[in-house]
C-alpha cells in the first residue's frame, strides 16, 4: 500500500471496501478489488514487500465453516488436541484447549461475533489457507507480498 514502509518504521493502513463475505465468495477477488485504485489496476495499492493482515474470521466465512450454536460443545471436543484449562462461571464453562494447528485458545477459537448464520470454526490448516490466498493475490496483482492470518 502506498507509503506503507518508511525508513523510520511501518504504517498500518486499513483495507476499506471489502463487502460482507459469505460462504462461497471469492475472497481473493474481493481483497484485490478493495486494494485496487480508481483506475482499476488490480491490487494497484499494493507494493512489493507489503504485508496484508487478514482475520481468520473472514477466511472461515468464505470457506463456509459455520455450525449451528447447539453444536458448539461437539465442535470444541472435535477440535481439541489437549485440554489446557476449564473455567467454570455462573452460567457457562469455558474450555481452553490446544487445537490441531498448534494455538492454545478458549473454546477452540469458535467465534459467534458478527456471524448471524451460526458459529464460525477456524480453518483446519491456516497455513494452507494463507498460502492459497497469497498465491491468488500474487497471480492477480503480480505483487510479492506477505500475508498473516490473525
Model-identified regions with their sequence ranges:
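N-terminal and secondary-structure boundary signal
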Residues: 1-150
